Structure formats: structure tokens, C-alpha cells
């Protein structure tokens, strides 16, 4: 009852609070008017509350609850009215056209990191393939230059000369052998026919006991002594004379003397060495003249002149005539 009476009184008294049915009657008010209205309503409510409390103390508890409820309703109405009154009057502010942001300059390029001394080396970027290509190019250039040089110079490879062995020194011709002296028989036998002396000497077999052999030996001994130029001197005179010093021949003379000896070895018949008689072979003159030697001696001549023995040595007269020295005890 109390709440209805208050509502009726409020409505009859002509409250200035806007109702929900007439929102357009709401006047625009500033914040101060709203605050005054809220204060006036609160005062009226307080005064009415005090009157109700005084009139009916029994119903005080119920009135407190109703007051609270009314306060809530009034607060809700005020909030809705404030929203409705302010919403149409709010004019959006004109936004000024914003100038476009200034264009930013492009970022500077990134600088490469500082190089270390190892990166500055010339072979820093070289690889194995690059080295191989470079070496092949250098080899090709070298071969091309060599070919050009050979073509310009016109060098021609000479054909290899055949190898010639060194010529041996010419051999010296051996001196001709001296001719042996021609034998002349004491008797008037016919002389032998002219022919090569060596063939004659080989054809004539000399007997060991014949005087021809002795004469040939004597002549050979005499020729050797004459060639050497040494004179026979008695033994007594030899002792008084000083022995001449032998001069050593030079090497060239020795070689000259030894060469003819080597080239002319002396031939000795086997028959003379062994002492056997040499068998005579058939000769041409034997076939022509019936086997008789034209220069051979008869058996008579051999008996007359063959008394000398072949083995007996020839006695030298100078040794027999010289006085023999008596051997003393070494005293003068």
C-alpha cells in the first residue's frame, strides 16, 4: 500500500522524471541537472520513508525492502534514460584526412664483412678444375710456339750416319829377307840353273859330313862376325883393355830390331834336329836328266875332300899362336 501511494503521489504531483512512454519529453541536461534530480528524488524518498516508519512501525522491515527495490528501479531507469537521451545528440567528430606517411628511403645495401688476409690471396678462389684447365692451355701454347719456331728456322733432322769403326794403323811392310850366297863347287862342275835361291836351298839336301856344309857354316859365321863389326882379339889383350860400356838402345831401336826377328822365324828341318837323313822327293830335274844332279859332286870328290869330319870343330890359328899365360897365386 505504501509503495502504491508513493507512486501515485509521485505521479500526481507531476514528477519531472521522464517516463518510458514519453522519451521525447526528455530535455537535454547537463551533468549538473542530473545530479540535482538524483539528489531531489533521494531526499523525497528519505522523507517518505521516515513518514512511513513513523506511521507504521510494525511494517518497517517490509518498507526497507521496498525502498531498496525502488532505488534499484530508479537507478535502472536513470541509466536507460541517460543512454536514450545522449545517443541521438552525439555527433561523430569529423576526422581530418591523415596525410600519407612519408616514403622511407630504401635500406642501404649490406656491406660485405671485412676480408681477412687469407682471403686476399690470388689463389683464394682457385679450384682443382681451374688449375687443370690452365695447365692444359699453357702446354698447348708451348707446343704451338715450338712448331712455329721449327717452321721458321727450317731445321731438318739430319739422317744418322752409319757407325764406322776406327781404322787400324797400317802395318809396316816387312823388310825383304837377305838372299843367301850362291855356293860354288871347287871342281868344274856345271853351275845350277838360275832360279829362286830359297827353292834351291830347300831342294839341296846337305849331308852332315860334306865339305859344303862346313863351308856354309864358316861363311855364315864370318858374315855374322863381319856384320857385328867385332874383331878377334887375343885373351891377353882383352884383359888389359877396359870393357866398353854398352849403350842401352832406345825403345824405338829395340822394336825395330825385334820386329824382323818375329816376322822371320828360323825354320829348322826335323831331320837336322833328330839327325836322321832327309828323304829326297822327286824333282823336275831328276825326271829330265835321268835322276842325276847337274851340280852334284862325284863320289871321288867326296872321298878327296870329305876327310874332314863334320863334327870336328874348326881350329882357330889365333888361339894356337898366342902365348898361354901361367896361372899364378895372384901375385904380380
Swiss-Prot record:
Involved in skeletal muscle excitation/contraction coupling (EC), probably acting as a regulator of the voltage-sensitive calcium channel CACNA1S. EC is a physiological process whereby an electrical signal (depolarization of the plasma membrane) is converted into a chemical signal, a calcium gradient, by the opening of ryanodine receptor calcium release channels. May regulate CACNA1S membrane targeting and activity. This is Junctional sarcoplasmic reticulum protein 1. It comes from Mus musculus (Mouse). Interacts with CACNA1S, CACNB1 and calsequestrin. Residues 1-80 are annotated as: Mediates interaction with CACNA1S. It is found in: Sarcoplasmic reticulum membrane; Endoplasmic reticulum membrane. Residues 221-232 have a biased composition (Low complexity). InterPro entries: JSRP1. Residues 98-116, 177-197 have a biased composition (Pro residues). Specifically expressed in skeletal muscle. Detected in skeletal muscle and tongue (at protein level). Disulfide bonds: none annotated. One of its GO terms (biological process) is skeletal muscle contraction. The gene is Jsrp1. Keywords: Endoplasmic reticulum, Membrane, Phosphoprotein, Sarcoplasmic reticulum. It comes from the Eukaryota. GO terms for cellular component: sarcoplasmic reticulum; sarcoplasmic reticulum membrane. The modification Phosphothreonine is found at residue 51. Residues 66-76, 239-256, 283-307 have a biased composition (Basic and acidic residues). The modification Phosphoserine is found at residues 223, 228. Residues 1-125, 159-332 are annotated as: Disordered. PANTHER family: JUNCTIONAL SARCOPLASMIC RETICULUM PROTEIN 1. The keyword Membrane applies.
Amino acid at each position: 500500500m505504501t509503495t502504491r501511494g508513493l507512486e501515485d503521489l509521485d505521479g500526481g504531483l507531476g514528477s519531472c522524471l521522464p517516463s518510458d512512454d514519453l522519451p521525447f519529453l526528455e530535455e537535454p541536461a547537463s551533468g549538473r541537472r542530473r545530479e540535482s534530480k538524483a539528489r531531489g528524488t533521494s531526499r523525497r524518498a528519505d522523507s517518505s520513508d521516515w513518514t512511513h516508519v513513523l506511521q507504521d512501525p510494525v511494517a518497517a522491515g517490509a518498507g526497507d525492502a521496498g525502498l531498496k527495490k525502488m532505488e534499484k528501479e530508479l537507478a535502472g531507469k536513470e541509466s536507460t534514460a541517460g543512454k536514450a537521451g545522449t545517443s541521438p545528440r552525439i555527433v561523430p567528430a569529423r576526422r581530418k584526412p591523415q596525410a600519407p606517411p612519408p616514403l622511407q628511403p630504401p635500406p642501404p645495401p649490406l656491406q660485405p664483412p671485412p676480408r681477412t688476409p687469407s682471403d686476399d690471396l690470388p689463389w683464394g678462389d682457385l679450384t682443382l678444375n681451374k688449375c687443370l684447365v690452365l695447365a692444359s692451355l699453357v702446354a698447348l701454347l708451348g707446343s704451338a710456339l715450338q712448331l712455329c719456331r721449327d717452321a721458321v728456322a727450317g731445321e731438318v733432322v739430319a739422317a744418322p750416319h752409319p757407325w764406322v769403326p776406327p781404322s787400324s794403323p797400317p802395318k809396316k811392310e816387312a823388310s825383304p829377307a837377305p838372299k843367301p850366297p850362291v855356293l860354288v863347287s871347287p871342281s868344274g862342275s856345271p853351275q845350277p840353273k838360275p832360279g829362286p835361291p830359297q827353292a834351291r836351298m830347300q831342294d839341296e839336301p846337305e849331308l852332315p859330313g860334306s865339305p859344303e856344309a862346313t863351308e856354309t857354316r864358316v861363311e855364315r859365321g864370318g858374315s855374322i862376325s863381319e856384320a857385328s863389326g867385332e874383331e878377334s882379339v887375343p885373351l891377353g889383350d882383352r884383359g888389359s883393355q877396359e870393357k866398353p860400356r854398352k849403350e842401352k838402345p832406345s825403345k824405338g831401336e829395340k822394336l825395330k830390331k825385334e820386329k824382323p826377328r818375329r816376322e822371320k822365324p828360323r825354320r829348322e828341318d826335323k831331320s837336322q834336329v833328330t839327325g836322321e837323313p832327309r828323304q829326297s822327293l822327286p824333282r823336275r830335274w831328276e825326271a829330265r836328266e835321268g835322276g842325276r844332279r847337274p851340280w852334284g859332286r862325284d863320289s871321288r870328290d867326296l872321298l878327296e875332300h870329305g876327310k874332314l869330319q863334320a863334327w870336328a870343330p874348326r881350329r882357330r890359328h889365333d888361339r894356337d899362336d898366342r902365348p898361354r899365360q901361367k896361372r899364378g897365386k895372384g901375385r904380380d
